Amino acid sequence: ITPKMSSDKYYLWDYYKSNRHPQTKKILRKKEKFMRNISDQDTILIPCTAELYRMKETDSLLIWKRTLLNDVCPVNAIVANDGSSIATFDNWYSTGYGVNVFVVYDETGNAKKTYKLEEISPFPLNDYMMSISSLHWNNAERYIDNGKIEIVFVTENNRQITRIYNTKNLAFEK
């Protein structure tokens, strides 16, 4: 997995381009000077991507390369042993928040299902340990076979519930 990348100048370029900055003479002069010296490379934002390889003897064969739904980069990613599905968890800098807390991709790298934490959590969101940027909700995730993912939810008080997700049905088991 390769995280989202940008040049050092990208966000300042984006800020100046948006005209959300104060319209003072001093700032407008800075903007004009900055914009004269910016290159096309400075304005490119490269999204988070993933590559899946199959190992064959001593060689590796690229199966697919895709852009992931995560804004910056998933915190964790797991792959079924047969490559039939891939799951990503959370977003870097914002664990537990957003629409891509849990994403299931198929064997070709296409997103099949996305979840917010409130859609999958067996606990109220207030039960999880919180920091300024994140909700710390899971203790572990792993494939228990090629079609099932075990996810361990853990609260701030160390209560745990393990849920099994079926990647074929795209649903949690009861």
Task: Annotate each predicted stretch with a short phrase.
Residues 1-174:
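Secretory-pathway ectodomains
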